[in-house]
């Protein structure tokens, strides 16, 4: 799903053009040299490898999907000399190794899948050190209110969607969850240039679940993703 990758000349054209999101977040990263970083919902590790080039001390990827963890490990098998990067088959809520206080946490594309968004934000707060940073990327609602997707319903074809917050409501929730210096640094609308079917992922993708006017098949406004940067109080 995430990529692209080039492995010994083999071009893996992933469903997501993940370098586009990387370009959006890169300029808002703190100086991460020497930092301990958690990449929540890391998938196959694409963003972890991008972060690795900025010389952190440690990156811990977490993902509950076994296939993504296996993909992560398959890629890492070609880079055995890299000891600063590892992946764990768990969520941020399940991670309980209290000896690590992370300097930076990335949670991208996770919050709207959470059954309990407050619990997810609290887990980030407990993992990051005081004054440490989080980068939270999530779909946001351009309607006057949150979008609450009911059980067995979909949003842009996606299942297991909970609440899609307005930017103001998410800002308020982050404040009440113990974060400060909250900034919305980027808004972008997903399109079929960034997410699409390829020979490596030949199932249905973004364009199959959206209308010509940009709305989703379910009638929601165009899919907007927002990037929040904040620090723990």
Residue spans of the language-model regions?
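Short alpha-helix
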Residues: 161-178
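Conserved SAM-binding loop of SAM-dependent methyltransferases across substrates and taxa
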Residues: 44-55
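A short glycine-rich, Lys/Arg-flanked "PGG" loop and its adjoining helix->strand segment in the class I
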Residues: 118-133
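A short SAM/SAH-binding and catalytic strip from SAM-dependent methyltransferases
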Residues: 103-116
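Short, glycine-/aromatic-enriched active-site segment of Class I SAM-dependent methyltransferases
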Residues: 139-161
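Conserved class I S-adenosyl-L-methionine
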Residues: 35-43
């Amino acid at each position: 799903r995430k990529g692209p990758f080039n492995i010994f000349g083999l071009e893996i054209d992933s469903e997501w053009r993940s370098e586009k999101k990387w370009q959006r977040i890169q300029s808002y990263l703190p100086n991460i040299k020497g930092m301990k970083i958690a990449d929540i919902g890391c998938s196959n590790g694409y963003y972890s490898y991008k972060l690795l080039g900025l010389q952190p001390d440690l990156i811990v990827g977490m993902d509950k999907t076994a296939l993504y963890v296996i993909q992560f490990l398959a890629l890492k098998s070609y880079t055995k000399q890299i000891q600063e990067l590892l992946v764990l088959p768990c969520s941020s809520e399940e991670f309980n190794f209290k000896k690590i206080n992370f300097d930076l946490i990335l949670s991208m594309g996770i919050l709207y899948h959470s059954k309990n968004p407050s619990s997810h934000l609290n887990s980030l707060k407990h993992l990051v050190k005081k004054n440490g940073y989080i980068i939270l990327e999530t779909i946001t609602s351009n309607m006057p209110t949150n979008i609450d997707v009911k059980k067995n319903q979909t949003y842009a074809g996606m299942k297991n969607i909970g609440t899609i917050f307005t930017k103001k409501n998410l800002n308020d929730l982050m404040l009440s969850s113990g974060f400060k210096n909250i900034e919305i640094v980027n808004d972008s609308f997903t399109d079929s240039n960034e997410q699409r079917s390829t020979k490596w992922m030949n199932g249905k993708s973004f364009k199959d679940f959206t209308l010509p006017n940009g709305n989703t098949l379910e009638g929601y406004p165009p899919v907007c993703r927002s990037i929040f940067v904040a620090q723990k109080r």
